[in-house]
Amino acid sequence: ERTKAGDTFIVELVGQTRDDVEALLKKFGEMPLPPYIETRLGQADRYQTVYANRPASAAAPTAGLHFTPKLLSDLKSSGIKILTVDLTVGLDTFAPVTSENPLDHPMHSEHYRVTEETLEECARAERVIAVGTTATRALESAATSGVLSGRTKMFISRGYEFKVVDLLLTNFHMPRTTLLMMIEAFVGPRWRDLYSVAIAERYRMLSFGDAMLLNRHL
């Protein structure tokens, strides 16, 4: 069954098991890509992190694309504790903010899961570094609501007080997106200076681009 929902279509696939549905998706579907990527990917794992463990999201958490198994191993060897969270990224993550007042933007909901152990470790940690806006949204949603697993419509924008994340590793985002508004909430107006330097130095932007490590305490 295929029904239109705004600018996208909802397709319902029916199978006997989850494996049947995933097989149908693999056979007939294509990996959703941001609208600015016009070339099909020859290998699907080029748009996937090395630590992804199950199909669910409509987009990869692109800050994680910078990590290799060796880099993760080196980080662990240096004493950095690595914890995981789940956030099922929806297609609306690509949608621009079209409302004149950004606070009127209809924020999409996404499913997240943060274990109690992860939240406790974050509370004990000297500092918490989130890899990507998706991990940030999951951690902040769990800490704010007290719900470890559920759906979140959290819109992190100017004035939000972060409860968990101290540093954020993230790529450079498109203008007029909720992702960029989260960056402004994290570091304030100096994000403009950071982007100006990146543009002047010809950094690569967006999903397959460079990343920056932001410290909200500076």
Give the label of every model feature segment:
Residues 1-218:
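Surface-exposed, charge/polar-rich loops and edge strands
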